[in-house]
From Swiss-Prot:
GO biological process: cell wall organization; peptidoglycan biosynthetic process; regulation of cell shape; response to antibiotic
PANTHER family the record matches: UNDECAPRENYL-DIPHOSPHATASE
Family of the protein in this entry: Belongs to the UppP family.
EC identifiers of the protein: 3.6.1.27
Major localization listed first in the record, in broad terms: membrane
Membrane topology annotation: Multi-pass membrane protein
Organism name: Corynebacterium diphtheriae (strain ATCC 700971 / NCTC 13129 / Biotype gravis)
One Pfam family linked to the record: BacA
Keywords per UniProt: Antibiotic resistance, Cell membrane, Cell shape, Cell wall biogenesis/degradation, Hydrolase, Membrane, Peptidoglycan synthesis, Transmembrane, Transmembrane helix
Protein name: Undecaprenyl-diphosphatase
Length: 282
């Protein structure tokens, strides 16, 4: 069966959307929301959730490389602890915290895949959530104590942040925004919440990207991409994602997440205005 040319993603889309993915994936401004906005604004069509999920593999590879030492330490401690109770230290517990914290989004993502793809990728929803969730950032900064260090992380924190990660399935929320806000609410230091947010995202996003790989070539919704386009897009997302991680960790050391709210609210209002005037379609 011949693929309809109009349903094939273009190279310009591939490059631009991969740049957007790399720059926004780790910032609390919603990469999925920005991809949706840019796709509609410049091409009048949605590239699709499958393309997004696969290109996310590039940004998640950036996390693996950036936190390679931390990940190796956690994995080593976890495996040692499985076979020797005397070696069940913090890294062993951290391994379980990442696993348990990943379960909520894995379950919800699988069960609600069709609902997310068919009903939640609406531009009005994206714009509304960009605005509404900005006030969650502000509240988390205002009422979170931000005192607890990395070695004070608990399984309760992992469960709460893991549940918050489910909100990232809605375009406009932001994976890091949801999990970091939850971390701030339970009293974690801003940088601690951000670092754990990155670690927590790895299993779920890698699984989502690999699971969506076949669908990206012939999607039920959105546009199809070639293997070369997916490879180039993933590479671009990796390079920019790595730089974005380094920048964000430095930024949160001395700046409030409320700065991102100051960006999200005008963007959400602008999108609503474009929708209302017919310059964008929902």
């Amino acid at each position: 069966m011949t693929q309809d040319p109009s349903s094939q993603i273009s190279w310009s889309q591939t490059i631009v959307l991969s740049i957007v993915q790399g720059l926004t994936e780790f910032l609390p401004i919603s990469s999925s929301g920005h991809l949706r906005i840019v796709s509609e604004l410049f091409w009048g069509k949605d590239a699709g959730a499958s393309f997004t999920a696969v290109v996310q593999l590039g940004t998640e590879a950036a996390v693996l490389v950036y936190f390679a030492k931390d990940i190796a330490k956690i994995l080593t401690g976890w495996f040692r602890g499985l076979f020797d109770k005397k070696q069940r230290g913090f890294d062993y517990r951290m391994g379980w915290m990442v696993i348990v914290g990943t379960l909520p989004v894995s379950i919800v993502g699988l069960l609600a895949k069709d609902i997310i793809r068919d009903n939640l990728r609406n531009m009005w929803i994206t714009a509304s959530v960009l605005i509404a969730f900005s006030f969650v950032f502000i509240a988390a900064e205002k009422w979170g104590s931000k005192r607890r260090s990395f070695d004070q992380l608990t399984m309760r924190d992992a469960v709460i942040m893991g549940c918050a990660q489910c909100l990232a399935l809605i375009p406009g929320v932001s994976r890091s925004g949801g999990t970091v806000s939850a971390g701030l609410f339970v009293g974690l230091d801003r940088e601690v919440a951000t670092r754990f947010s990155f670690l927590l995202a790895i299993p779920a996003v890698l699984a989502s990207g690999l699971f969506s790989l076949p669908d990206a070539f012939a999607p039920d919704a959105g546009q199809a991409a070639s293997g070369m386009q997916l490879a180039v897009g993933t590479g671009i997302a990796f390079a920019l994602g790595y730089a974005s991680i380094a920048w964000l960790l430095k930024f949160v050391g001395s700046h409030s997440f409320s700065w991102f709210a100051a960006y999200r609210i005008p963007v959400g209002l602008l999108v609503m205005a474009l929708l209302a005037t017919g310059m964008l379609t929902a």
